[in-house]
């Protein structure tokens, strides 16, 4: 379950010893944490307008950056306050986790639909999935974890660095596809034992 800043992917893979067989994969290249940030910025706008009767510019990166800060805080706290500068001066705005989760529910539902598509395409069901791995910074959002746990009937596995997993995977994949002369003999031997079969993640068109 890979939910990053701008994309979402879900993959079912079978791992035996050091062989990784990708069975099915689905994704949405326009769904990610940036959508969560925008929804928080919309909450800023709603509350600012209520008090000042004027709107803030949601295209301004300042509000998106402030929204991202709020998102990170709400991953560990139930609510937070943020000072927001608007057309009619600064305003302290309070955002609760409950408000945030309600605002992003549509996006979480989209990820659930893609999981169900992957399950159907592979002929699998949640009971046959041994482990659920999270990748991508947006998987820190409690509502995401809660939704996934409920759907799969088990909590995701902890211990994987959600920020570094993609980079590590890409490095291994590149090593499998090319001859990397910077590797020492021990690293080359370890890499030679890894076998990966992959599928195309997205429809490529005709």
State where each predicted segment sits:
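Oxyanion-binding/catalytic loops of NTP- or PPi-dependent enzymes
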Residues: 1-206
